């Protein structure tokens, strides 16, 4: 259960939510991605309430989402890399003309991303389910980041991937931030949260117990104390940090 969770993510910012798994992060993202209904409070994107919109409507607002479970929620394993790359944009004019898919454009787009993200595969027609976990994740990240999102939610984006894949994913997230995207990063990886985040909020037992508007001087040991519930900020400290 979430308890009075309130924060804002600005354009050109990576807002990190750190916490041991099972402390409300999944519930929070489920609300933001419309997997759960919002019964109290509100969620706004560029000032517009999205709590009654479908995920399809939200995606039209240049919204990207890298889910925690890439196999169950991020890919269609029996479909090709090319098909997975455009699964969130099949009906757009970029890849569809007169009601027909432009397979040449789709494959060119997939090939560009395969090269940019260094996806190890036999070609764009290979089934995504045949890839390694790290390469599956790069397909998901490429799809969600390649349409210039205004907002990106990245949920445990490098879990279970090798160092090389993690480096590529981190680089892309930071590039999006530098281009003005508002990034919400949810991570249980202390080093990842500290490396990428401009601001960090710590969740424990469904509430924000610490809010760092400046991560300079913050280290893994200190952050870990808040994640374990051993320390917490006062309500006044959180209010001041949020501005």
Question: Which positions does each model-derived feature cover?
Answer:
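Glycine-rich phosphate-binding loops of nucleotide-dependent enzymes
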Residues: 1-243
